């Protein structure tokens, strides 16, 4: 069977067998990565380890205070006894992206639940980006 077999046409686009294979492979890869990434939910819908808790706290800070205040935030609850300047010592884009997408895709969910699902969805979407 030829991979260039024409299946049907939509407008000027000819849908071929190779397109169906690519869609199938990407769907399978997305599904498998979603299953692997969400295995932690088998033990409860909780944040595990210390980094996710800090990422949640930093995202919550941006949601409550705004991005400008985040760049001025000196966190005295970490790096005892002096604290730290968060914007200089952490992943700014991770926190900013989660805080920006929360009002859009949060669908009324709690921020805590959103920060649990955020890495699962974005990790699975990265499979498609890597394929491209």
State what each model feature region is.
Residues 18-22, 42-44, 73-84, 112-116:
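Short linear capping/connector segments at secondary-structure termini
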Residues 44-58, 67-76, 86-97:
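Extracytoplasmic catalytic/substrate-binding loops of multi-pass membrane glycan-assembly enzymes
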Residues 62, 80-107:
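Short hydrophobic/aromatic helix or loop-helix immediately within or flanking a transmembrane segment
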Residues 109, 113-132:
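Transmembrane-helix motifs of polytopic, lipid-linked glycan transferases
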Residues 29-35, 66-75, 105:
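Active-site-adjacent bridging/hinge elements
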Residues 33-34, 51, 83-84, 100, ...:
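Acidic, glycine-enriched active-site microenvironments
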Residues 13, 42-47, 103-106:
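Asp/Glu-centered strand-loop micro-motifs enriched in Gly/Pro and often flanked by an aromatic residue
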Residues 1-39, 50:
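Start-transfer (signal-anchor) and selected internal transmembrane alpha helices
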